[in-house]
Amino acid sequence: MAYKREKGLLYVVATPIGNMGDITLRAIDVLKEVDLVLCESAKETKSLFHKLGISTPVLALYKDHSETPFANVLEQLKQGKSMALVSDAGTPGVSDPGSQMVRTARENGISIVPVPGASALTALLSVSGFQVNPTYFLGFLSEKPSKKRRELERAREIEGLIVFYESVHKLPRLYPILEELFPETEVLMGRELTKAFEEVVYYANPRELANNPPNAKGEFVFLLNHRKKSLKGNSDSTDM
């Protein structure tokens, strides 16, 4: 279905997390036709647009942590301009600053339209084979080991899937915490999802992960199947 230009809308547009083929036709249509694209990094977004043949102007919202760009953007939206919000990769608002713009727009009466697509979170869930309800998403874990531990301790109270992102240089400090807090929990690791060196590896428990660590390069997402043994591997009763 072709994009129909409408005034005063903010489109929240997912972009690829690695494989350019994951951009949707609708996303391309929207990004070509809006008046302005709001982004994290102008450099990253312009690089994507060059590959897609998109010439729409871009504005980096968060470079100076100022509220001034937000005020200017809101004024233009209220005047009838249409805009799209993108992140550097994946779905805006999922472990990036995008939710701030969406919340501000909603508080000011701006209509918001999702244009869904790639996400490392849903990509790993889709290949897990685990019952996905409930899923507790932590985003990126904290930098400090003590705070990281507290976050995982709170998550341990949930019986279900626990999903989080982790930076490559923090992996050695992560493994001992997982071994202590989740000694019998299944682990699914996704590395460089949708990219050339993509890996999805299953570990029976965190000790197996620590003894056979993945290549310490790239971007990582982890899934812990933290539930009773009798529930592990069950299929969902609903599908969306």
Swiss-Prot record:
SUPFAM superfamilies this protein is in? Answer: Tetrapyrrole methylase
Record flagged with keyword Methyltransferase: yes
Q: What does this protein do?
A: Catalyzes the 2'-O-methylation of the ribose of cytidine 1402 (C1402) in 16S rRNA.
Assigned EC number: 2.1.1.198
Q: Which gene encodes it?
A: rsmI
Keyword check for Hydrolase: no
Could you tell me what this protein is called? Answer: Ribosomal RNA small subunit methyltransferase I
* The reaction(s) this protein catalyses: cytidine(1402) in 16S rRNA + S-adenosyl-L-methionine = 2'-O-methylcytidine(1402) in 16S rRNA + S-adenosyl-L-homocysteine + H(+)
Q: Which family does it belong to?
A: Belongs to the methyltransferase superfamily. RsmI family.
Q: Which GO terms describe its cellular component?
A: cytoplasm
Q: What keywords appear on the UniProt entry?
A: Cytoplasm, Methyltransferase, rRNA processing, S-adenosyl-L-methionine, Transferase
Q: Where in or outside the cell?
A: Cytoplasm
Q: Which GO terms describe its molecular function?
A: rRNA (cytosine-2'-O-)-methyltransferase activity
